[in-house]
Amino acid sequence: LFGIEEKQGDEKVDMTTEDASITNSTSVMMTTVAGDENAIGYISLGSLDDTVKAVKIDGVEATVDNVSNDSYKIARPFNILTSDKESDAAKDFVNYIMSSDGQKIVEDNGYIKEAADAKAYEAADGVSGKVVVAGSSSVTPVMEKLKEAYLAVNKDAEIEVQESDSTTGMT
């Protein structure tokens, strides 16, 4: 995010110190940082709890408002990517997530909602099927809440949330 990679010749080189501990999950990061007063790590704002504290950047606290107004400089969005052959069930689930109903869940769980002007969810008739959502441990807690709420309004759908880590990337 901030100068970890440097250009050397024609390639980028990761300049992370060899003394760094690199984890593959939010919970491991939080446990590691909580147990070592000299440790620092990064997690999603929605994962922040009282076991660790957020670092001020240029004197700015990590809050939803400060991330939303771009005054807190370390932030990344959660992206929802789908296949070209997206099923009706997947489209409907994404519509739910992006609706005011879904965005309220996002906001209520300490994450940053996408749009203040999102419209209420309108259920599509006859939508059924399985949707597999794979993503970072950063997004899993809120995705589980979104899944639970969506299944309450569409009992014919099946949502499977698979947790990985941010380094896995997308295929």
What are these regions (language model features)?
Residues L1-T171:
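Exported/periplasmic ABC-transporter solute-binding proteins
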